[in-house]
């Protein structure tokens, strides 16, 4: 069985329509933060009822969020997805990311001066204890999705806050509006960058697996010439990809591991910290 994350927006509604005849269950999260939230939920409910599709809904109303709302919402969302995934014994979760998301994520990474092992978003990966699949990531642009929905007369909701330059992704998205040729050039550039990284990625994965077999001991880490990459994978794996690491932060972590001083811990964020216990590197929750 496949789990499909459906917000009621155009991308996820097309994804749902494409897979409606498969063995699926739908998960919808309503943050009740926008006036149109109830409308989006009803769109999903009506479609699932009409097509006899199993639907699980999470309604959130607690907004005592300390820090970044998007980080909080993402954690709540994926915690819920994991529960549904396990309840129905799903083999994968489908997400509706498309080519525009692919380009935007790359530009966000560049803006934040990040140096990921793989630029932008993978079509398939394993995270949060789930097999994640993004069928549209190299298939459709946003404008293509909208045309298909119009032709098939599929109802969907538009998030009106996307037009507001509140968040970095919104600013990048709005800056790329009507710049189709530029988006395509950036898309091709990302594919080339990732292609030339393949050999390096294989070597890094070998080093990481070797380090993992040694229970993430300090000595094996120090032997690798890919320390920055090992830290990125290690932190991502141990925190379910919940921490955005800048290059500066990665360098601080490496300095902490290398240090012979009796430093007990390195704070990663409000939830996680790093420790050196008998020359073994660990990520712990506060």
Curated annotation (Swiss-Prot):
Catalytic reaction(s) noted: cytidine(34) in tRNA(Ile2) + L-lysine + ATP = lysidine(34) in tRNA(Ile2) + AMP + diphosphate + H(+)
UniProt GO BP: tRNA modification
Cytoplasm in keyword set: yes
UniProt subcellular location: Cytoplasm
Keywords (A to Z) from UniProt: ATP-binding, Cytoplasm, Ligase, Nucleotide-binding, tRNA processing
Coarse class of the protein's main subcellular location: cytoplasm
GO molecular function: ATP binding; tRNA(Ile)-lysidine synthase activity
EC nos: 6.3.4.19
The protein's enzyme class: ligase
Entry's Gene Ontology cellular component terms: cytoplasm
InterPro entries: Rossmann-like_a/b/a_fold, TilS/TtcA_N, tRNA_Ile_lys_synt, tRNA_Ile_lys_synt_N
Binding residue positions for ATP: 7-12
Annotated function: Ligates lysine onto the cytidine present at position 34 of the AUA codon-specific tRNA(Ile) that contains the anticodon CAU, in an ATP-dependent manner. Cytidine is converted to lysidine, thus changing the amino acid specificity of the tRNA from methionine to isoleucine.
Protein name: tRNA(Ile)-lysidine synthase
Phylogenetic lineage: Bacteria, Bacillati, Mycoplasmatota, Mycoplasmoidales, Metamycoplasmataceae
